[in-house]
Amino acid sequence: WTEANRPKLDWQTKIFYSGSACMYPEYNQTDPDNPDCREESAYPAAPDSEYGWEKLFSERLYLAYNRNHGIPVRIARYHNIFGPEGTWDGGREKAPAAICRKVAAVPPSGGSIEVWGDGLQTRSFLYIDECIEATRRLMESDFKGPVNIGSEEMVSINELVDTAAKVSH
């Protein structure tokens, strides 16, 4: 995006930014009994990684562009989207794919898998079709400001492992 493009835009132009729940403060993401990831809970800012900081800073840049130039901006904060064609391995996969891959590798006679942390961490998971529908609705709306796109249901990593194990063998 450059200022040179600005004169070419018409009144229907909107800018979309794909954010992430990783921009929420680490303390909001680690308490399984109180996973506070409401849009307004982003501050005071304290993401747990450079990726989270990049997502937060980028949101601020797009919102500043909106304020300064009047072009509508829509920001989606995605939460663990999964579905077909998602990355399955290699370290970039989401938790559902990583857990399913690990569970599928356990022989029917039994075994264990590595779970980072204590497994009590909770996450919001959303199927890709629901994600696409939510994104479409966001783009068609007049809503201003970042919007979470994820499920309201929080699932612990241990629950995800148990579910994957039940359906795999």
Which residues fall in each region the model found?
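Conserved Rossmann-fold NAD(P)-dependent oxidoreductase catalytic core, especially the SDR/UDP-sugar
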Residues: 1-49, 74
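Active-site Tyr-X1-5-Lys
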Residues: 3-5, 26, 46-79, 98-109
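Active-site loop of short-chain dehydrogenase/reductase
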Residues: 6-15, 70-72, 110-112, 118, ...
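Proline-centered turn/helix-capping motifs that create local helix->coil transitions or kinks
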Residues: 16, 22-32, 70, 104-111, ...
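Conserved short acidic donor-positioning loop in nucleotide-sugar-dependent glycosyltransferases
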Residues: 21, 99, 152
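Short glycine-/acidic-enriched loop or helix-start segments at secondary-structure transitions
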Residues: 26-28, 85, 158-160
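Glycine-rich "substrate-gating" loop/helix at the edge of Rossmann-like oxidoreductase active sites
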Residues: 47-51, 79-93, 117-129, 151-155
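C-terminal substrate-binding subdomain of Rossmann-fold SDR/epimerase-dehydratase oxidoreductases
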Residues: 105-169
